[in-house]
């Protein structure tokens, strides 16, 4: 049995932000959400998040995850933070996994290894360590040949010889809670910062073993925007390598970004300068980009998208989107549709084989199958107070520069003459002309007296 505690009380002053550090986004998820994601496969019995700075904002940002929150009203160090758990874990006899809310790149496999080593060896504590190329600023961990920790020395207290040791404390621990609970009340703040350090407890609980993480990048903490950008680069490399190995083609990967919440099927091709975000799913054979943004959208097989923005929308097999189209607000595009340049769809549903080829806005509309929307067709959906729907039947064709003033319904097989403004419903099989008659006055200029 394991309980997880996540330290998320710090202010993060080096971020220079009003937003709590742990809520800063990294590839579509906040830093602390990524930490929470990494422990979910461990099936912890409880997930406790220790909050302090802007506690209510952090709670609100995580409320959908059904966590337990423990407040550290004054931030007096990591040991003090874990002391706040004492009344919440009274009588608990299992293990406590302690993580930092600003270390978002940890893999679940690493935590599984830490927990397995801890439980197999019946350690009082097991700590995660790593060998850094440049360990400056990190506490050094000294072990015997069996990885039993002999000493942890803070960087500022290291002798020149001790600084040659590049094995550092990652600040991630697994404790036998009964042992730790006995030590926590006796921690002392005997340091310049007058803080209570969890490392002081580590040396007092009993046998402590160290486990090395293979990739030191996993334990990188985020303290400023530069480190946030570095973490994003690492995360993107992981995600893109995963998809390329799974049969997805990325043309110029360095110019492409993909959230790790995105799902792609084999034989998808992603062109340069394309960005895939949120809960996006793209099926096999689709070609996306160049220069496109797709967010929280589902695309079928063999869809093509060029230089377009698609959010919160669904596109069926074989549709062609762009260039320079904008789909949003739960747009639904049927199979083998064509959405051309400078077309915007908002909260609009199109049936199969419907074309909106260029220069049109369809908002709050429904169009059937094999509809052809002429260039410059607009649905006037807003009356200044509320929005209304437009309904267009199967095989209907609108001429160029038509305006459909909602609420209005066009039946099946309707022809709308170019330049018409439609304000009333049109029955099936009709030609509708709603424009003023052209008047030509020969010789008007001379008769008017204009020179």
Curated annotation (Swiss-Prot):
Binding site for acetyl-CoA: 375, 381-382, 400, 418, 435
Annotated region described as Pyrophosphorylase, given as residue ranges: 1-225
UniProt cofactor(s): Mg(2+)
Coiled-coil regions listed: none
Sequence positions that bind UDP-N-acetyl-alpha-D-glucosamine: 7-10, 21, 72, 77-78, 139, 154, 169, 223, 328, 346, 361, 372
Free-text cofactor note: Binds 1 Mg(2+) ion per subunit.
Enzyme class: transferase
Entry's EC annotation: 2.7.7.23, 2.3.1.157
Disulfide bonds: none
Region (N-acetyltransferase): 247-451
Subcellular location: Cytoplasm
Keywords per UniProt: Acyltransferase, Cell shape, Cell wall biogenesis/degradation, Cytoplasm, Magnesium, Metal-binding, Multifunctional enzyme, Nucleotidyltransferase, Peptidoglycan synthesis, Repeat, Transferase
Linker: annotated segments: 226-246
Chemical reaction(s) catalysed: alpha-D-glucosamine 1-phosphate + acetyl-CoA = N-acetyl-alpha-D-glucosamine 1-phosphate + CoA + H(+); N-acetyl-alpha-D-glucosamine 1-phosphate + UTP + H(+) = UDP-N-acetyl-alpha-D-glucosamine + diphosphate
Pathway in which this enzyme or protein is active: Nucleotide-sugar biosynthesis; UDP-N-acetyl-alpha-D-glucosamine biosynthesis; N-acetyl-alpha-D-glucosamine 1-phosphate from alpha-D-glucosamine 6-phosphate (route II): step 2/2; Nucleotide-sugar biosynthesis; UDP-N-acetyl-alpha-D-glucosamine biosynthesis; UDP-N-acetyl-alpha-D-glucosamine from N-acetyl-alpha-D-glucosamine 1-phosphate: step 1/1; Bacterial outer membrane biogenesis; LPS lipid A biosynthesis
MF terms in GO: glucosamine-1-phosphate N-acetyltransferase activity; magnesium ion binding; structural constituent of carboxysome shell; UDP-N-acetylglucosamine diphosphorylase activity
Entry GO CC: carboxysome; cytoplasm; membrane
Active site: 358 (proton acceptor)
UniProt binding sites for Mg(2+): 102, 223
GO aspect biological process, one term: regulation of cell shape
SUPFAM superfamilies in the cross-refs: Nucleotide-diphospho-sugar transferases, Trimeric LpxA-like enzymes
Function description: Catalyzes the last two sequential reactions in the de novo biosynthetic pathway for UDP-N-acetylglucosamine (UDP-GlcNAc). The C-terminal domain catalyzes the transfer of acetyl group from acetyl coenzyme A to glucosamine-1-phosphate (GlcN-1-P) to produce N-acetylglucosamine-1-phosphate (GlcNAc-1-P), which is converted into UDP-GlcNAc by the transfer of uridine 5-monophosphate (from uridine 5-triphosphate), a reaction catalyzed by the N-terminal domain.
Quaternary structure and interacting proteins, as annotated: Homotrimer.
Family to which the UniProt record says this protein belongs: In the N-terminal section; belongs to the N-acetylglucosamine-1-phosphate uridyltransferase family. In the C-terminal section; belongs to the transferase hexapeptide repeat family.
PANTHER family, sorted: BIFUNCTIONAL PROTEIN GLMU, NUCLEOTIDYL TRANSFERASE
Name this polypeptide is given: Bifunctional protein GlmU
Species, as recorded: Trichormus variabilis (strain ATCC 29413 / PCC 7937) (Anabaena variabilis)
Gene designation per UniProt: glmU
């Amino acid at each position: 049995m394991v309980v997880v505690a996540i330290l998320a009380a710090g202010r993060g002053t080096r971020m220079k932000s009003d937003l709590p550090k742990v809520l800063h986004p990294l590839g579509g998820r906040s830093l602390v959400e990524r930490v929470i994601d990494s422990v979910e496969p461990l099936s912890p019995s409880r997930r406790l998040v220790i909050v302090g700075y802007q506690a209510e904002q952090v709670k609100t940002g995580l409320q959908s995850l059904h966590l337990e929150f423990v407040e550290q009203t004054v931030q007096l160090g990591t040991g003090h933070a874990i002391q706040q758990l004492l009344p919440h874990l009274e009588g608990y006899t299992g293990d406590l996994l302690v993580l930092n809310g600003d270390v978002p790149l940890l893999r679940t496999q690493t935590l599984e290894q830490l927990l397995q080593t801890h439980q197999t060896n019946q350690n009082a504590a097991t700590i995660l360590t790593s060998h850094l190329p440049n360990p400056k600023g990190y506490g050094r961990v000294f072990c015997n040949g069996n990885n039993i920790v002999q000493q942890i020395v803070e960087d500022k207290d290291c002798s020149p010889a001790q600084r040659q040791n590049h094995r550092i404390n990652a600040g991630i621990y697994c404790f036998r809670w009964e042992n730790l609970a006995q030590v926590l009340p006796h921690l002392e703040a005997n340091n310049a910062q007058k803080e209570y350090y969890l490392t002081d407890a580590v040396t007092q609980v009993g046998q402590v073993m160290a486990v090395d993480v293979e990739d030191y990048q996993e334990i990188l903490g985020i303290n400023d925007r530069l480190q946030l950008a570095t973490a994003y680069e690492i995360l993107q490399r992981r995600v893109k390598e995963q998809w390329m190995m799974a049969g997805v083609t990325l043309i110029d990967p360095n110019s492409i970004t993909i959230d790790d919440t995105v799902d792609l099927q084999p034989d998808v091709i992603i062109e340069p300068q394309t960005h895939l975000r949120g809960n996006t799913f793209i099926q096999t054979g689709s070609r996306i980009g160049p220069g496109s943004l797709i967010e929280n959208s589902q695309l079928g097989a063999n869809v093509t998208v060029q230089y377009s923005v698609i959010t919160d929308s669904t596109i069926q097999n074989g549709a062609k989107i762009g260039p320079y189209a904008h789909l949003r607000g739960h747009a639904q595009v049927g199979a083998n549709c064509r959405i051309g340049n400078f077309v915007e769809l908002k909260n609009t549903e199109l049936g199969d084989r419907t074309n909106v080829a260029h220069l049109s806005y369809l908002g709050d509309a429904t169009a059937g199958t094999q509809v052809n929307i002429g260039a410059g067709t607009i649905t006037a959906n807003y009356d200044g107070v509320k929005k209304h729907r437009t309904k267009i039947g199967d095989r209907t064709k609108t001429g160029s520069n038509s305006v459909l003033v909602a609420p209005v319904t066009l039946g099946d097989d309707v022809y709308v003459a170019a330049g018409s403004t439609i304000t009333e419903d049109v029955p099936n099989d009709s030609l509708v002309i709603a424009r003023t008659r052209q008047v030509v006055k020969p010789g008007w200029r001379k008769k008017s007296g204009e020179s």
